[in-house]
């Protein structure tokens, strides 16, 4: 029997490089001689580590482009939509899609672009360039004329948001008239765009035949071009949906307008009520200014007090010319028991009040004495 073959250096290096850390520690413990341990350690330092290649994960298949997404990417360029942000146009694009009669064509175009993208990548297959080539070929309406051709009118509601209204007596455009009686497949679309220079590196799979195609018979052509059947049945259903939606929106808008009008009327009525109450308050409030003087009734007593005060003030003013220390007749501080004529410096401010002729010697005793006003009030 042949003896065991000694492993080569490459085999030893591969063996050591594929060991785990715990296995390497066990090998180190098995070597007892110091020289052998040194040689083993030096060998470990020179070994090139083996790179573990992770298992290849199959690339996840990309999601195919949705027909509505393709429609939105193409017709978002409608010139009337430029002033508005995308969040305000989302509902409008959905409304256009519901009434669009070319949904089958958009499904074919979306599938064709998805096949090209999956092979060459999204960077090598720009979606806007793809639509710019194939849409005019299929005679789809240009974004600049789409609203007019399909009977749509863009307006603004009371909230300032854009809104679409269907024009009465308008007939939506059908699919491309030049291709209405031809069978159209995904491969036909890919072949056309490649001839136009789009995605030249794409290689179609000869064994893959797409079951997706679009075809119209001559009878369908007659039905579309006949005046009595100018609108397809599907388009009529879409129009009925749009009309129902517009009626619901108009009803909600009318309710909002009625509510706003009622609120405005209530506010005006409340304002008028406040104004009337303020007018009543102003009428009842006396005018601003000094307090009026009290209206006292006339009585003889108050009239006599008033005359006495006024006469006393007049006497004080008229007595200002007499000498200082003179005893005046109207001085209430003099002694009543002492005769006026016996006073020194006696003076009176009533020279014309007393008739002294009645008191001279030999005077007529029947002479009339002066009359004093205060006797009548005694």
Swiss-Prot record:
Molecular-function GO terms, alphabetical: DNA binding, bending
GO biological process: positive regulation of mating-type specific transcription, DNA-templated; single fertilization
UniProt key word Transcription regulation: yes
One Pfam family per UniProt: MATalpha_HMGbox
DNA-binding region: 60-117
PROSITE patterns assigned to the protein according to its UniProt record, in alphabetical order: ALPHA_BOX (PS51325)
Localization terms from the record: Nucleus
Biased composition range(s): Basic residues: 244-253
Family: Belongs to the MATALPHA1 family.
The protein's role, per its UniProt record: Mating type proteins are sequence specific DNA-binding proteins that act as master switches in fungal differentiation by controlling gene expression in a cell type-specific fashion. Transcriptional activator that induces the transcription of alpha-specific genes.
Name of the protein in question: Mating-type protein MAT-1
Annotated gene: MAT1
């Amino acid at each position: 029997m042949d003896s065991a073959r000694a492993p080569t250096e490459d085999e030893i290096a591969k063996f050591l490089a594929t060991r785990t850390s715990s296995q390497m520690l066990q090998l180190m413990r098995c070597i007892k001689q110091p020289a052998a341990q040194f040689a083993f350690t030096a060998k470990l330092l020179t070994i090139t580590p083996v790179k573990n290649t992770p298992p290849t994960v199959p690339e996840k298949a990309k999601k195919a482009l949705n027909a509505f997404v393709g429609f939105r990417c193409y017709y978002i360029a409608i010139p009337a939509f430029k002033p508005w942000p995308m969040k305000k146009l989302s509902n409008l694009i959905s409304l256009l899609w519901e009434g669009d009669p070319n949904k089958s064509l958009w499904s074919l175009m979306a599938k064709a672009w998805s096949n090209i993208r999956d092979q060459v990548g999204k960077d090598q297959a720009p979606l806007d360039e793809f639509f710019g080539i194939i849409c005019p070929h299929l005679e789809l309406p240009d974004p600049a004329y789409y609203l007019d051709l399909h009977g749509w009118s863009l307006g603004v509601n009371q909230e300032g948001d854009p809104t679409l209204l269907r024009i009465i007596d308008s007939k939506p455009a059908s699919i491309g008239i030049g291709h209405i009686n031809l069978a159209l497949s995904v491969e036909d679309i890919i072949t056309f765009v490649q001839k136009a220079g789009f995605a030249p590196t794409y290689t179609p799979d000869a064994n893959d035949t797409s079951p997706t195609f679009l075809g119209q018979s001559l009878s369908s052509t007659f039905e579309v071009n006949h005046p009595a059947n100018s609108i397809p049945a599907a388009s009529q259903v879409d129009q009925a949906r749009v009309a129902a939606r517009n009626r619901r929106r108009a009803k909600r808008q009318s309710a909002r307008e009625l509510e706003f009008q009622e609120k405005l009327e209530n506010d005006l009525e409340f304002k008028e009520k406040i104004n009337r109450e303020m007018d009543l308050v102003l009428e009842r409030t006396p005018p601003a200014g000094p307090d009026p003087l009290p209206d006292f009734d006339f009585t003889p007593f108050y009239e006599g007090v008033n005359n006495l005060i006024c006469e006393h003030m007049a006497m004080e003013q008229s007595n200002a010319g007499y000498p200082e220390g003179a005893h005046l007749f109207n001085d209430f501080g003099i002694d009543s028991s002492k005769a006026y004529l016996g006073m020194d410096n006696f003076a009176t401010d009533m020279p014309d009040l007393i008739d002294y002729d009645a008191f001279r010697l030999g005077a007529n005793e029947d002479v009339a004495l002066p009359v004093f006003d205060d006797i009548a009030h005694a």
